[in-house]
Amino acid sequence: LRPQDDIEMAETILRAPVRLFGALTPWRLGCWGIALVVAAPLLGVVASMGGADGATLRHLAATTLPEILANTLALAVIVALGTGILGIATAWLVTMCRFPGSRTLEWALLLPMAMPAYIIGYAYTDLLAFAGPVQTALREVFGWRRGGYWFPDIQSVGGAGTMFVLVLYPYVYLMARAAFLEQSVCVLEASRMLGARPWRSFVAVALPLARPAIAGGVALALMETLADFGTVQYFGVQTFTTAIYRTWYGMGDRAAAAQLASMLLGVVLALLIMERTSRGRARFHHTSRRYRAIRPLALSGWRAIAAILACATPVVLGFVLPVWMLVRLHAIAGDRISPSLFAS
C-alpha cells in the first residue's frame, strides 16, 4: 500500500465510531449514560438467562405457553385497533369540528387516563356480573332465568382488552390531536381542489401525515398493556406478565422467568420493527413556512349530535361510569375512609 492509502485507511477507522455513535460531545455522552442506566434492568434480565436448565421452560411450552402467547397477541391486537380508532376519531372531531361541548370534551377526553385499568376492571366486573345491576335489571324486565340467556363474560381476553382500550386511548388521542393541529390547512385545501371529498382528504392526506405520532401513541398503549399485571391477573387471563410472576415466585425458577421476560421483550421489539419496516424510508416534514391554522367546521343538527355522542361515549365509559360504580359500592358498604390511610 502507498503511504496515502495508509493514511486514508487510518482516517476511515477513526471515523467509524463517529458514524456509529456520533460526535462524542458531553451532551451525547450524557445521553448514552442515561440510556445505559435505563437499559440496566433489561440487561440484567438477559444476563439472568444463563443459569436456566430449560426444564421449566419446556414444561411451560408443553402446557400453558401457547395460551400465554395467544392471549398476549390477542390483547395487543385489541388494544392497537381500539385505541387507534378511538384516539384518531376523537382527535379529528375536536380538532376539525366545532359542536356544542367540543371545548369541554377537548380536555374531558383525557380523564380516562387517570383510571388504572385494574380499577376500571373492578367496577365493570361488579356492573356486569350475574348479580350486578345490569343483568339483574334485564332479568326483571324480560323475565329471564339463570342459564336461560347469553351474556358476554367480562372476565375474558375481550373484556380485559376493552378495559385497556378505555383507559389507554388518550395516548393516541393526545399525539394524534397534536399532529392534526400542526398540519397546515393548505394541504387539505389542495386535496379538496383536486376533487377529493372530506373523507378522502382525511384518509389520503391528514392520516398519513399524522402516522408517526399515531404510531407512537399506539406503541405507548401497547407497552402499558404488555407490562400490566393487575388487570390480567384479576380477569384470569394468562399472559407473559402473569407467567413471569408465577414462574419466579411460584416455581422458584428465576432463570426461566428471565427467559419468559426475554420472550416478551422480543414481542415488543418485533412490533416496533414491523411498524418501522412498514413505514420504510418515509419521513414527514413541513417543507414550507406558509402555515395557516385549520379553521374548524361548525356542525349542527344530527351531525352535531353524532359528534357529541362519539366524543362523550369514551369519557362516560372510561371515567364517569367507573367513578359512579365505585361511589355506589362505597355507599353500599357504608364504611368510612380510615384516617390511617392518610398517615405519613
Regions flagged by a language model, labelled:
Residues L226-M251:
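Glycine-rich helix-loop "coupling/hinge" segments at transmembrane-helix boundaries
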